[in-house]
């Protein structure tokens, strides 16, 4: 049985993917993204160093629309990254989390997406 993202890709349904992950991860994510994301999709990035930046760079290199939602420290102070995580979770159709199993920020975003009923794919690295 195919996953929801696979079926959407096959049927050319536009999907908005949040691609998030641990800052400590320095993995090649090209194959992960190219297997899941089509030219007509959109990637949402949190703009953080690591997976967020790599995903945005991959999208730009492949002509895929990108939205970067950065934390608004001026308004929310030190809670800004957590509020940004919730905004990303609410804005996406599917979340791809490339996670080291330790990052609390990535876990926070995963939990927001699950609570919002979004499809979440966790790739442990």
Stretches found by the model and what they are:
Residues 4-125:
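Acidic/glycine-enriched connector segments
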Residues 1:
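Non-catalytic, low-structured ubiquitin/UBL-interacting segments
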